[in-house]
Amino acid sequence: MNLNGEQKSAVLLALVGIDKAIEILKELSIQEIENIAKCMSYMDVISSITADLVLSEFCNEVRINKDQNISFINNNFIISLLKKVLGEHHAVLLLDKFKNQKNISDNIKKLNLINPEKIVSLIKGEHPQIIATILIYLNRNHAANILSYFEDNLSLDIIRRIANFSSLKKLGQEEFVKIIDNLINKYQNSMLNQQGIVTAVELLKLIKRDQETKILTKMFSSDKVLAKRIKTKMLEFSDIINLDDVYIRRLIKVFPLYELSEIMKVEKEEFKKKFYKNMSLENTNLIKNYCSKKIFISNDLIQKKRNNLLNSVKKILYNS
């Protein structure tokens, strides 16, 4: 574990105990105290090995029990320390500040791992200022991908708010923590629900086709919404060719022509005809012209475009 100077100072203060730590902190500036305290609030537990390395760097005479770990949170070390150095009021304010910052940091890490489209579905109902603030904290590439899903006017509003952003005030910080916590909870609940759908789909795919049909038919009569979710999830790319023409025409209206052209270039003639008969002659000729060109398209890109097309089909079917 690589520690910077302030982190090493935090470890050392934890080892020398409250009384000696107080005497040391009295010699430091308020900013230095805040920086070290912030390190303590973020570090949580330090292994005895790491602590021993810090000790050996500063003082060869000091050693610790090899079974002893250092916890800044569980033993209330930082709380007692700050109260004695800064007074209870300032200590509480500082600890609340660190707690909020840590919560934001932890949850932003989680948001950075969530698919951009999923995040859009989570935040699209939020105020543009909330969306802008979330994007500020996210990884830049991740934030850019999320922004691309919004319509132009909203994107412009979000960018303007990002450009004018200065900082989160204390009250705003606390509210922001609650908002992100809520988003994470909504995502986790949706994932649990989604996992149930996935399991149901996997089971239906393993049973005989006529039995699957009977189950879905009965489900449509008792719980149409759930049945549609399962049926939509079961759809595969190869099933697109069997869709009714009315769905193909809806798909053509919403799916980018250039992406469809890339897919068509590698698909069989039967698949192409399914789309050609449902689109204008102009678009048909544009796709045919593209397919006739010698253009290399990677398998990864083709698979991505196919997934995009399949997802568009699923949305149409689910909302119909």
Curated annotation (Swiss-Prot):
It comes from Buchnera aphidicola subsp. Baizongia pistaciae (strain Bp). FliG is one of three proteins (FliG, FliN, FliM) that forms the rotor-mounted switch complex (C ring), located at the base of the basal body. This complex interacts with the CheY and CheZ chemotaxis proteins, in addition to contacting components of the motor that determine the direction of flagellar rotation. It is a peripheral membrane protein. It comes from the Bacteria. One of its GO terms (biological process) is chemotaxis. The record marks R161 as: Part of the EHPQR-motif. It is found in: Cell inner membrane; Bacterial flagellum basal body. This is Flagellar motor switch protein FliG. Belongs to the FliG family. Gene3D superfamilies: 1.10.220.30. Pfam families: FliG_C, FliG_M, FliG_N.
